[in-house]
Amino acid sequence: MSRIGLKVIEVPEKVTVTKNGDDITVKGPKGELTRYFDPRITFEQKDGEIHFSRSSEADKALHGTERANLASMIEGVTDGYVKKLTLVGVGYRAVAQGKKLTLNVGYSHPVEFEAPEGITVKTPSATSIEIEGISKQVVGQFAAEIRDVRPPEPYKGKGIRYEDEYVRRKEGKTGK
């Protein structure tokens, strides 16, 4: 039995959840999200709660996945998601101008990113980046793409890392 799939989702008053064919739309104070919802999983909405059920035992994993996706959509349109990145290294800095993010991270050229639709990028300081949006998947994907430009290396810890990420350090070579 899918334990995640059996959990009930509490729907805030400001949020509406509607199903249109195979798509599900969630509207809230921060915006609107639409995504494909597998027809093998059904849901029932009553008294500000959503209950999920599946048609067969073979759809056990899908049951929990669809429930988690809908829960993250509801959280996104009410509170939104924020990912914070930190740049560690001499001369590493980031500058955000509107939808454009420019990184100087030790290459001979600056690396530029265009923020996807619905994503805002801020640089509170030259060495920190904040990515905000209503879609958990898009925010996480964009943060991962930025981190992949210069992931933290294990010897000095230089690179782009998530704010709460722990970088496992290695010892360098020992002399004779």
Swiss-Prot record:
Gene Ontology molecular functions: rRNA binding; structural constituent of ribosome
Keywords from the UniProt entry: Ribonucleoprotein, Ribosomal protein, RNA-binding, rRNA-binding
The keyword Nucleotide-binding belongs to this UniProt entry's keyword annotation: no
HAMAP family: Ribosomal_uL6_B
Pfam families: Ribosomal_L6
Recorded GO CC terms: cytosolic large ribosomal subunit
Recorded coiled-coil stretches: none
Name used for this protein in its record: Large ribosomal subunit protein uL6
